[in-house]
Amino acid sequence: MGRGWDWADMLAYTVSGYGVVSMDVRGQSGYSQDGLRSPLGNTVKGHIIRGAVEDREHLFYKDVYLDIYQLVEIIASLPQVDEKRLSSYGASQGGALALVAAALNPRIQTTVAIYPFLSDFRRVLEIGNTSEAYDELFRYFKFHDPFHETEEEIMETLAYIDVKNLAHRIKGEVKMITGLDDDVCYPITQFAIYNRLLSHHA
């Protein structure tokens, strides 16, 4: 979906006593838009590869990760928030961003990540294109670099946003949920995150 859930979907958390903050990812059809750097409306493909040809500073997800960090800082500064009890939660892209939030900001004490996306891009290339989620990687090489002459450079750049490379930074407790028959966010790419966690995890 690429955007925060509808508020009605979060009522179960609020009636359980949790304060809830939801983030729209820039340029992905949420209620808030980043008109300066992302087009208005929805974009489905191109987020992973965007900026990878230039360098890691131009990566789309680098900016999204900075958004996540800033969001945690804003939440922690609110007077009604106990910054020692912050958690992150999400599924797919949201699962990846929940882990990124915990990796970049040690204020996050617990994280629940359901079938997290954005991990082990090299393994994704080895598996082959079976789903829309990573299609843009294969389309890049098919149409722009069919001989894979830039593959090493692209993979090195994408390593900067690969969630598995951030996993060791997480200090809080992590719970991960996956499906072993997931052909969108492949389980083996999720294990790459799980196996690099140094904090308590299940």
Where are these regions (language model features)?
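Cap/lid segment of the alpha/beta-hydrolase catalytic domain
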Residues: 5, 11-14, 19-66
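Gly/Ser-rich "nucleophile elbow"/oxyanion-hole loop immediately N-terminal to the catalytic nucleophile
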Residues: 47-92
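Short glycine-enriched nucleophile-adjacent loop
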Residues: 76, 89, 95-106, 111, ...
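Hydrolase active-site cap/lid region
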Residues: 100-149
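Active-site nucleophile elbow and catalytic-triad environment of alpha/beta-hydrolase enzymes
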Residues: 149-166
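Short beta-strand/loop motif that positions the catalytic acidic residue
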Residues: 169-170, 176-178, 182
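Conserved alpha/beta-hydrolase "acid-adjacent" motif
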Residues: 183-189
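Catalytic histidine neighborhood in serine/cysteine hydrolases
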Residues: 194-202
